């Protein structure tokens, strides 16, 4: 079975073709980072217009990369939410139109389920059950996963997501959008211990997160200590250490609560090298395992949508003729496969 995956939930146009026997056959990605950089963040209208320009050409490129024709595609999967409504509608409309024209099933995919399943694309995929840490610019969640669609929300951010906090703090440090990866690079030059940031909500029970206060703490630290290069690097180091420690503490609690031995990390922030190293060290000490996707599959991409679509199609998750998207869509509302 060959599934064409279409991802247009935010500012990346991702197209991929996944074969359930031969794996990933094609992967095309276009990033709108340069388009939105001057605005310091994603402009929804511009994102939608760029998806309109790029989606069909990338589909053509993916089919060519795979050495296939349209007749070789068995289903079309598209991101139906959550995300920016205009951006979602582009991918959903194209996906439904192609499925109708090719007379194949159309499969709506939950964006965060795509992220959650992205590590399944690797050579050593995780087995159920596991705790999933979904950490990105829009979400920070801990989820108990016992099977496809069997998701229990254990905790989530009550304000800013971790990735959003990274980008906002990077902006305070004078870094360009998207600032999260640049902040991490700057943090590598910082001196540990010069500044100490709080570890929000770790002094109380529970698995929820709060990262908005770290941005305020960073702003005050910058104001009081200047903006020379070393000071900025030291602040970046302190901020990153605080976020990583907080995520690690909450992951440890979630593993203790569930009794699971496997941790899956997914979403854009899961590409952070410091976070990967710290969680790998923690899981080794616990006698468990940590799983994550390769860096290019941590951010938004079509491969995860094609794979998730294949899984859902096998569970009879085909859509009707209507084009429906859900900008807000709790992962817990998905049916079990």
Swiss-Prot record:
Compartment(s) of residence: Cytoplasm
Catalytic activity: L-threonylcarbamoyladenylate + adenosine(37) in tRNA = N(6)-L-threonylcarbamoyladenosine(37) in tRNA + AMP + H(+)
Sequence similarity: Belongs to the KAE1 / TsaD family.
CDD domains assigned: ASKHA_NBD_TsaD-like
Entries under HAMAP family matching the protein: TsaD
One Pfam family cited in the UniProt record for this chain: TsaD
Organism: Cronobacter sakazakii (strain ATCC BAA-894) (Enterobacter sakazakii)
Xref: InterPro entries: ATPase_NBD (IPR043129), Gcp-like_dom (IPR000905), KAE1/TsaD (IPR017861), Peptidase_M22_CS (IPR017860), TsaD (IPR022450)
Described purpose of this protein according to its UniProt entry: Required for the formation of a threonylcarbamoyl group on adenosine at position 37 (t(6)A37) in tRNAs that read codons beginning with adenine. Is involved in the transfer of the threonylcarbamoyl moiety of threonylcarbamoyl-AMP (TC-AMP) to the N6 group of A37, together with TsaE and TsaB. TsaD likely plays a direct catalytic role in this reaction.
Top-level taxon: Bacteria
EC number(s) from the headed UniProt entry: 2.3.1.234
The protein, known as: tRNA N6-adenosine threonylcarbamoyltransferase
Binding of Fe cation, residues: 111, 115, 300
PROSITE patterns: GLYCOPROTEASE
SUPFAM superfamilies in alphabetical order: Actin-like ATPase domain
Originating gene: tsaD
A GO cellular-component term linked to this record: cytoplasm
Residues that hold substrate according to the record: 134-138, 167, 180, 272
Cofactor field: Fe(2+)
GO molecular function, one term: N(6)-L-threonylcarbamoyladenine synthase activity
Gene Ontology terms describing biological process: tRNA threonylcarbamoyladenosine modification
Cofactor note: Binds 1 Fe(2+) ion per subunit.
PANTHER family reported in the protein's UniProt record: TRNA N6-ADENOSINE THREONYLCARBAMOYLTRANSFERASE, TRNA N6-ADENOSINE THREONYLCARBAMOYLTRANSFERASE, MITOCHONDRIAL
UniProt keyword terms in alphabetical order: Acyltransferase, Cytoplasm, Iron, Metal-binding, Transferase, tRNA processing
């Amino acid at each position: 079975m060959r599934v064409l995956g279409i991802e247009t939930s935010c500012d990346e146009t991702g197209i991929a073709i996944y074969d359930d026997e031969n794996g990933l056959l094609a992967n095309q990605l276009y990033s709108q980072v340069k388009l939105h950089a001057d605005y310091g963040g994603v402009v929804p209208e511009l994102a939608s217009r760029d998806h309109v320009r790029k989606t069909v050409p990338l589909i053509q490129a993916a089919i060519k990369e795979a050495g296939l024709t349209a007749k070789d595609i068995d289903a079309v999967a598209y991101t139906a939410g959550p995300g920016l409504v205009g951006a979602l509608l582009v991918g959903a409309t194209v996906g439904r139109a192609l499925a109708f024209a090719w007379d194949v099933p159309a499969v709506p995919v939950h964006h965060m389920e795509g992220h959650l399943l992205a590590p399944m694309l690797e050579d050593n995929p995780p087995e159920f059950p596991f705790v999933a840490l979904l950490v990105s610019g829009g979400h920070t969640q801990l989820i108990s996963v016992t099977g496809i669609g069997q998701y229990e929300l254990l905790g989530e951010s009550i304000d800013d997501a971790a990735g959003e906090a990274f980008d906002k703090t990077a902006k305070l440090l004078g870094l360009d959008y998207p600032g999260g990866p640049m902040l991490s690079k700057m943090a590598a030059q910082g001196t540990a211990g010069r500044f100490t940031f709080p570890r929000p909500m770790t002094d109380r029970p529970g698995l929820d997160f709060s990262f908005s206060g770290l941005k305020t703490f960073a702003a005050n630290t910058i104001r009081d200590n200047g903006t020379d290069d070393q000071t900025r690097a030291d602040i970046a180091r302190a901020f990153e250490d605080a976020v990583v420690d907080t995520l690690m503490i909450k992951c440890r609690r979630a593993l203790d609560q569930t009794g699971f031995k496997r941790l899956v990390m997914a979403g854009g922030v899961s590409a952070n090298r410091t976070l990967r190293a710290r969680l790998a060290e923690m899981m080794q000490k616990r006698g468990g395992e940590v799983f994550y996707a390769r860096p290019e599959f941590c951010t938004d991409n079509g491969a995860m949508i094609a794979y998730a679509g294949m899984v859902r199609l096998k569970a009879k998750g085909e859509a009707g003729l209507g084009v429906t998207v859900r900008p807000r869509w709790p992962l817990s509302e998905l049916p079990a496969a």
